[in-house]
Amino acid sequence: QLANEPPIEIIRQESTDNGDGNFNFLFETANGIYKEVSGYPTANGAQAMTGSFRFPLDDGQIVEVSFTADENGYLPVSDFIPTPHPIPAHVLETLAIVDELVRQGATWDEQGRRIT
């Protein structure tokens, strides 16, 4: 927030904590920021959460993210999260050839030249 701008109003805020590891939290601001999280204990005694958040970009687009955080880590899902390009078929074929050569005992020097 810039120094000369007024604070952004929180138009909705809710929070519940059952005291047993289950909780819900939600807030929404006047400028379109929103977050909602539900937490719960897992069978192994850890804490897990699911939720979502959204916020506007300067160009008017709305970024929306849903997520799970549990024993598998933080797993966000959003159209705005970059995904790697597919590996080209010729690269996959080359990697398969190298794997086979390694299985056959091939070795290479520091410059990548095959020794055996």
From Swiss-Prot:
Reported tissue expression: Arthrodial membrane.
Keywords: Cuticle, Glycoprotein, Pyrrolidone carboxylic acid
Molecular function terms, GO-annotated: structural constituent of chitin-based larval cuticle
Residue numbers of Pyrrolidone carboxylic acid PTMs: 1
UniProt domain Chitin-binding type R&R: residue ranges: 20-85
Cross-referenced InterPro entries: CHIT_BIND_RR_consensus, Cuticle_Struct_Prot, Insect_cuticle
Residue numbers spanned by region Disordered: 1-22
Glycosylation (residues): 83
One matching Pfam family: Chitin_bind_4
Matches recorded under PROSITE patterns: CHIT_BIND_RR_1, CHIT_BIND_RR_2
One of the record's GO cellular component terms: chitin-based extracellular matrix
PANTHER family noted in UniProt: CUTICLE PROTEIN, CUTICULAR PROTEIN 47EF, ISOFORM C-RELATED
Protein name: Cuticle protein AM1274
Gene source species: Cancer pagurus
Taxonomic lineage: Eukaryota, Metazoa, Ecdysozoa, Arthropoda, Crustacea
